[in-house]
Amino acid sequence: MNRQDIAVSRIFKGKWERDEHRFLVVTHARDVYMTNAVPKGHQAIGRQGFETALTDAFYEHIRSFARTAHNRNVYALSVYTDERHSFLLYLNTLEGFERTITGSPYYCSYSEEQKHDLKYSLGDFAFSYATFQGPFASQYAAYHDAVKALSAAGGPDGLEPYKGSPDLVRYVYKAELFEGGQFLTALHVTKRLLAQSVWLLQTTPDFAAFASSGSEYIDYSVVMRQTIDTERFYRIFPEMKSCDEAFQAAVEEARGLPYGEQVTYWWECVRENRNRQPDALLTATVRTDYQAVEALADVGAPILPAVMQALRSSVQQGDQEKAAFLCEVLLESGGLSREVLGEMAAAAEYAPPGDQEIRSLLTRTRQKLTGRL
């Protein structure tokens, strides 16, 4: 099971638990620390402030592009980010796309389907922007100092607390910007550019603006749909309408099964999706494991006893992957009771002796669920 796909999809859908009460301090010496309070005399840079600065920086790139002869038949704009927290702006025009594919040594062998796929492949876009000028350039560099420190420390809890003088502090960032926050930033900046900057561009009738996560399965199943209305989405990607219909038919068919069999059905879909086999449901319909989690969670409270029974069984068998999937279903579900939390605590007792990973999984999940009650 791909927990990263699940986490990123959940973030893009706005189902994200932000770290709102901690801050990262970046000193003039580029050292990075954690703190629970903003050092005196400083203001923390949060999501809104960072998004505004990034939007303004990309606006300048768009304005510069708009003044060139290339500003015609612009059909796509995308704000890209990934686990490395880089932010890139991509633009493409029909002419730029034509130059890209005709310049390829494989041009003569491209099918129409391949050409269409390349049309929205960011790596084949003719115009991209990854550098910044002015005050945001130093803020962005310090932001990446924090990213590197978090990676080296294994997360916020691995950073040392800041005990130095406020005079040594260069920037203070809210922790919500990191650990997945970059994906929400990319989406919000895309929406801002769509509202504030696209008027500068000479766009095509089917112009599309979208964020990108670096995973086509996440992008097509979740991300693009946040900024492209359904009618336009199907017009640009007609194959996705067939994928959506096929997946929805599978959802409706599964709903007719007994609850225990529904749990088994979606778990088997996740297992089949491990290696992206072309005939696997999630792969064939351009979905991720998140949609399997969501399909079960959407059934609601009636399916929870079957989920808990399957969880106890997977814990007893030491099947960490299946247990993790079922925990994700619980995290996606609403209306959980304290009784379910009690059952999770009891389920840990079924774990094989010495299997601390499953015990830790259940503890982390239970803590997250408890925080929602």
Feature map (PLM): residue ranges:
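N-terminal interaction modules that seed assembly of large macromolecular complexes
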Residues: 68-107
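Amphipathic alpha-helical elements of HEAT/ARM-like alpha-solenoid repeat scaffolds that form extended
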Residues: 265, 269, 283-296, 320-334, ...
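Buried hydrophobic core positions in alpha-solenoid tandem helical repeats
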Residues: 266, 281, 307-311, 341-348
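Low-complexity, serine/threonine/proline-enriched polar segments
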Residues: 103-181
